A protein has these predicted regions:
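Bacterial Sec-dependent N-terminal signal peptides
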Residues: 1-14
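Extracytoplasmic/secreted envelope proteins and their assembly/folding machinery
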Residues: 51, 76, 80-84, 112, ...
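N-terminal propeptides
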Residues: 2-5, 21-186
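Structured, acidic catalytic/metal-binding patches in enzyme active sites
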Residues: 196-402
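N- or domain-start disorder-to-order transition segments that initiate the globular core
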Residues: 182-200
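Sec-exported extracytoplasmic/periplasmic mature domains
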Residues: 56-60, 84-91, 95, 120-128, ...
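A cross-kingdom marker for long, charged
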Residues: 400-460
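Solvent-exposed, acidic/flexible segments
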Residues: 43-47, 72-76, 108-112, 133-137, ...
Length: 460
C-alpha cells in the first residue's frame, strides 16, 4: 500500500469518529504495561466548570489533581510551574512584551493576593490592545474583579489567606480565557449554522484526539453551545452502556486472537506490541477490529501521558463533559450499538486484512512519526478553521471498503436525523458534534442538508 494512502487511512479513522472506540477501549482494559487506575481527582464543585476549560490549556499538569495536594497550599515550585505555563499560553497571542523576563514571589507561603497580583503583573507585561481596558490608575485586584476574574467583594476575598493549588489554577484559567476572548483569539474550529424556520443547528466538526492549542476555542463556538437547548453526538462515550460493546469486541468462546488469525499476523502483532511497549497478551481476548481501532490511536502519542492528554483534549469529550456540568441534555445520533455493529459485522478475513494494514503502519520505521504528523496537520486545520485544507488531507484513498463504512451510509442517516430536528415545531436550537470528515467531505452531511433546501452557513 502506498505510504500516503496508508497514513491517510489512519487520519480518516480519527476524523470519521471511530476513535471513540479506542477511547472506550482505554477504559475497559490496561493497554500499557505500567498503567494503573488513578485515584479520584480532588476537585471542588465550585471550580470544576472552570477547570474543565483550564486543564485543556496545558498551563498545569493534570497529575496535580491526583497527587494529594490540589486542595492544599500551593508550593513555590508549583506556583512557578503555573506562572510559566500561563505565560507560555499568553505568549501565543503574539503581543510584544514590555520586559523580557519577570520575577514572581518565591515566599514559602503564597497568598491569594500574591496569586492575583502576580497574574495581573503577567498580563500587564504585554502591550495590550484597547479591548483589555488596562490602565495604570486601576489597582490589580480592582482590575481582576472588574473583569470577572476574581469573584466576590474585596472584604470577602481573604487575600492574606494561603492560596491552594486549586484556587491558583482557577485564577490562571480564568485569566487565559479572558485574554484570548479580549484579543478575539482562540481556535477557529469547523462550524456550520443550519436554519429552517425557527430551528437552528450548530454543526461542529470534531477531532477526537486533541491538543492544548485547540483551547480555548473561539468565544463564538462556546456561545453557540451555551445558546443551544441540547447536545447531539455520535455516541455518548461517558454515559453510554458499555455492555453491548464489550460483548461485540471480545471472543466469548474461550478462544483468543491467536486462534483466529494467521501465524504471520499474530507474530506481527507481537512485534507491534513490543514496539509500543505493551504487554504481549494485552489484546488476547479481543477481535481484530477492536485491536485495530485501539492501536490506531496509540501510534499518535509518544507516551501514556501524551495519549491521556490527547484524549482529554478531544472535542467530543470536551463538549460531553461540558454538557454534563451544565445540565444540558445529551442525545446520540448513532450510539454504541450502531458503531459496535459497524465493525463487528465485518467478515473476519477483512478484519484481519485491516489489522495487518495497521500493524504494517506501526512497524514501518517512520510509521508512527508520520501518523502523528498527519494527526497534527488535521488538528492545525481545525485550529485555523481550514475546512478545505482538512478535506484535501482526507480525500486520498476514500475508495476502499473500510472508508465506505466510515463515510457514506452513516452520513445519509445522520442527515435524516438532523432534518427531523430542523422540521420540529416551535423554536429549537441544537449543538451537533460529529467527526469532522462527515462535514467537510463532499456529498456528505453538510451537502445533504443543502440539497434538502436548508440554509447552511460556514461560520468563521
Amino acid at each position: 500500500m502506498p505510504e500516503q494512502k496508508r497514513w491517510s487511512k489512519l487520519t480518516r479513522w480519527t476524523a470519521a469518529g471511530m476513535l471513540s472506540f479506542s477511547i472506550l477501549l482505554g477504559n475497559v482494559f490496561p493497554v500499557h504495561a505500567e498503567t494503573t487506575a488513578p485515584a479520584a481527582p480532588q476537585i471542588s464543585e465550585w471550580s470544576v466548570k472552570t477547570l474543565n476549560e483550564g486543564e485543556k490549556y496545558g498551563i498545569y499538569p493534570i497529575n496535580w489533581y491526583y497527587d494529594g495536594s490540589f486542595q492544599k497550599s500551593i508550593t513555590p515550585d508549583k506556583f512557578k510551574t503555573l506562572m510559566e505555563g500561563t505565560e507560555t499560553k499568553l505568549d501565543k497571542l503574539g503581543f510584544n512584551k514590555k520586559v523580557a523576563s519577570l520575577s514572581f514571589p518565591t515566599d514559602k507561603v503564597i497568598t491569594r493576593e500574591t496569586v492575583i497580583t502576580s497574574l495581573h503583573k503577567l498580563l500587564a507585561n504585554y502591550e495590550l490592545p484597547k479591548a483589555f481596558d488596562m490602565t495604570a490608575d486601576m489597582a490589580p485586584i480592582d482590575y481582576m474583579q472588574n473583569k470577572g476574574l476574581v469573584k466576590g467583594t474585596k472584604a470577602g476575598l481573604e487575600l492574606d489567606k494561603p492560596s491552594t493549588v486549586e484556587h491558583a489554577a482557577v485564577m490562571a484559567s480564568r485569566l487565559v480565557e479572558f485574554a484570548y476572548d479580549a484579543a478575539g483569539a482562540g481556535a477557529e474550529g469547523l462550524m456550520w449554522k443550519v436554519t429552517n424556520k425557527q430551528n437552528t443547528l450548530y454543526l461542529l466538526g470534531s477531532v477526537h484526539l486533541g491538543l492544548t492549542d485547540m483551547y480555548p476555542m473561539q468565544k463564538s463556538i462556546r456561545e453557540a453551545f451555551d445558546a443551544s437547548d441540547n447536545l447531539w453526538v455520535e455516541l455518548d462515550m461517558l454515559n453510554g452502556d458499555m455492555s453491548y460493546f464489550n460483548e461485540k469486541m471480545q471472543y466469548s468462546d474461550g478462544t483468543t486472537i491467536k486462534d483466529h488469525v494467521s501465524k504471520e499476523t499474530y507474530e506481527k502483532l507481537q512485534k507491534a506490541l513490543t514496539k509500543l511497549d505493551l504487554q504481549g497478551n494485552a489484546f488476547d481476548g479481543f477481535k481484530p477490529f477492536a485491536i485495530s481501532t485501539s492501536l490506531s490511536t496509540l501510534g499518535y502519542a509518544q507516551n501514556p501521558e501524551a495519549y491521556q492528554m490527547a484524549m482529554l483534549t478531544g472535542i467530543d469529550n470536551y463538549f460531553i463533559t461540558k454538557a454534563m456540568l451544565t445540565g444540558k441534555p445529551i442525545h446520540e445520533l448513532e450510539g454504541i450499538k450502531l458503531q459496535a455493529d459497524l465493525f463487528a459485522n465485518v467478515p473476519p478475513a477483512q478484519q484481519e486484512k485491516e489489522l495487518n494494514t495497521m500493524l504494517d503502519s506501526i512497524l514501518n520505521e517512520k510509521g508512527m512519526e508520520e501518523s502523528a504528523e498527519y494527526l497534527k496537520k488535521m488538528q492545525l486545520d481545525w485550529i485555523e478553521g481550514d475546512a478545505e485544507g482538512l478535506a484535501k488531507l482526507l480525500e486520498v484513498g476514500f475508495e476502499d471498503e473500510a472508508s465506505k463504512r466510515l463515510i457514506g451510509e452513516r452520513d445519509k442517516n445522520m442527515a435524516l436525523k438532523l432534518a427531523k430536528l430542523l422540521e420540529k415545531e416551535g423554536e429549537n436550537t441544537s449543538f451537533v458534534v460529529v467527526g469532522a470528515a462527515h462535514y467537510v467531505t463532499k456529498g456528505m452531511v453538510v451537502d445533504l442538508l443543502k440539497e434538502k433546501g436548508y440554509t447552511v452557513q460556514y461560520l468563521q
